[in-house]
Amino acid sequence: MSNLLGQKHILPLCLLLPLLVVIPGLLSGSQPVAWLFATDIGQTVLWQIRLPRVLMAFLVGALLAWAGVLIQGMVRNPLADPGLIGVSGGAAVGAALFVVLVASGLALPGWGQTLLAFGGGVLALLVVLKLGLSGQSLQAMSFLILAGIAVNVLASAVIGLLSYMATNEALRQITFWSLGSLSGADWLWVVTMALALTAGLLFWPRR
């Protein structure tokens, strides 16, 4: 009976916890809370800067958690994550390549970094699947993890080469990207992330 009551409280608790994080995130900052609601500039800061960043952080965290769950189910390993099978490394290579190309004078749109990072992650995943799924059953999962580790090592080497070739400013941008930043968050990115999360939930094979 106690286990049943505990399970019933899991969903409300999961819905409540994000609110406990989002609200302090909106109200914390260099300016007092009253300033956010008393001036036009404060309203702009609240609705156009702070709220998109907080929602973006929430959605990105949800997507990362979802990706981790899917990969853990795929490889049947509760310790697996996107970094283990090379997806994160491939995405980092794509993003670093964009920074180096722009620093070299090549004119690329701002969304090109996202596109190259996505393409790098997909390419790394395809390589890992090709190398790792040559076996059968449990052995195939072991091969998959080993292939992911190999791709990660290769990605680290490529990032090291790109960092060596990069200018000081480009190297700083690569470092900031690898650390993660929400400074460029806006409502367009929030909607995009929400659609990506919704699509993942709808098309997830429930097996």
What are the language-model segments listed below?
Residues 1-207:
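Alpha-helical transmembrane segments in inner-membrane proteins
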